[in-house]
């Protein structure tokens, strides 16, 4: 029997994950009191294979009952029952945005002090996070990307040895994306904005792309950038990191950063990674440029 404990920060996407797991044959129970884990596992083991994949969502909604989780997991281990822990998290800014959009109340912030509730929750969950088998940060994942990550982990034959890489082009005048692990400033490349024929085009247009890539310093930068990510990604994976967010910035986020991001996207797509790209500031009218 495969026993999975799902926990993590409120608002990080546990409900979505449960849906994806149910779709691939997991028997899921939401908000189970930790004291019942052992009993429930015994029942499943006695089902003669009818229940072979189980996912239990256990989080701070249980209040003080959550304190029983670690002792109960230790008891499972002592009784010879194997389990895995999936821990979901997201950045404070993303969690606050999700709560405001959903208008839901955080379990530890009934008075509305969201940031205080999130901070308290992180402290409570710190020990279980350290023992997690898998940690997924959903801050920069679309539902489709999150589903792909779940399938990669829990569907036999779907697991891959690469990394989920998100590339974000942006304009420094609009701020650096808070979710970035790495940020590269490409404002050293001559700016197509000042050439009339390219001023209102973007780095996705061939004329702009060819212009940006025509400089010797661009070619040297791309060589060094490729070498760096080829060095970093395997070492990140070795340390247990499964996602990487790379930011590429220029002044306005329409020309140079877009062209460089597209080039990096094409390069990484040829590797064993799942790569996504988002031109955050290419168009400020709200249209999505993610793929």
From Swiss-Prot:
One Pfam match, given by its short name, reads PapZ_C
Q: Which Gene3D superfamilies match?
A: P-loop containing nucleotide triphosphate hydrolases (3.40.50.300)
Residues that bind GTP? 59-62
Q: Which GO terms describe its molecular function?
A: ATP binding; GTP binding
Positions contributing to ATP binding: 8-15
Top-rank taxon: Bacteria
Keywords from UniProt, A to Z, are: ATP-binding, GTP-binding, Nucleotide-binding
User: Per the similarity annotation, which family is this?
Assistant: Belongs to the RapZ-like family.
**What is the documented function of this protein?**
Displays ATPase and GTPase activities.
PANTHER family, alphabetized: RNASE ADAPTER PROTEIN RAPZ
Name of the protein: Nucleotide-binding protein Cthe_0113
Question: Organism source for this protein?
Answer: Acetivibrio thermocellus (strain ATCC 27405 / DSM 1237 / JCM 9322 / NBRC 103400 / NCIMB 10682 / NRRL B-4536 / VPI 7372)
């Amino acid at each position: 029997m495969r026993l999975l404990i799902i926990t993590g920060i409120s608002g990080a996407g546990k409900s979505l994950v449960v849906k994806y797991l149910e779709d691939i044959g997991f028997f899921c129970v939401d908000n189970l009191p930790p004291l019942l884990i052992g009993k429930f596992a015994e029942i499943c083991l006695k089902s003669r294979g009818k229940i072979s994949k189980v996912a239990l969502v256990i989080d701070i909604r249980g209040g003080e009952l959550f304190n029983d989780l670690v002792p109960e997991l230790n008891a499972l281990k002592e009784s010879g029952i194997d389990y895995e822990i999936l821990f979901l998290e997201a950045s404070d800014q993303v969690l606050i945005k999700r709560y405001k959009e959903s208008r839901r109340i955080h379990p530890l912030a009934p008075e509305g002090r969201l940031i205080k509730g999130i901070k308290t929750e992180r402290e409570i969950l710190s020990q279980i996070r350290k023992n997690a088998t898998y940690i997924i940060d959903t801050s920069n994942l679309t539902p489709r990307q999150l589903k792909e990550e779940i399938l990669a982990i829990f569907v036999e034959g779907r697991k891959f040895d690469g990394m989920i890489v998100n590339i974000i082009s942006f304009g420094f005048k609009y701020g650096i994306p808070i979710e970035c692990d790495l940020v590269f400033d490409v404002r050293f490349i001559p700016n197509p904005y000042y050439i009339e024929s390219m001023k209102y085009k973007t780095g996705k247009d061939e004329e702009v792309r060819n212009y940006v890539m025509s400089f010797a310093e661009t070619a040297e930068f791309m060589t060094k950038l490729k070498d760096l990510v080829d060095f970093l990604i395997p070492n990140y994976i070795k340390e247990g990191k499964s996602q990487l967010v790379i930011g590429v910035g220029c002044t306005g986020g329409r020309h140079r950063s877009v062209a460089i991001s597209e080039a990096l996207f094409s390069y990484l797509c040829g590797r064993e990674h799942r790569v996504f790209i988002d031109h955050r500031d290419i168009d400020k009218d709200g249209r999505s440029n993610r793929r």
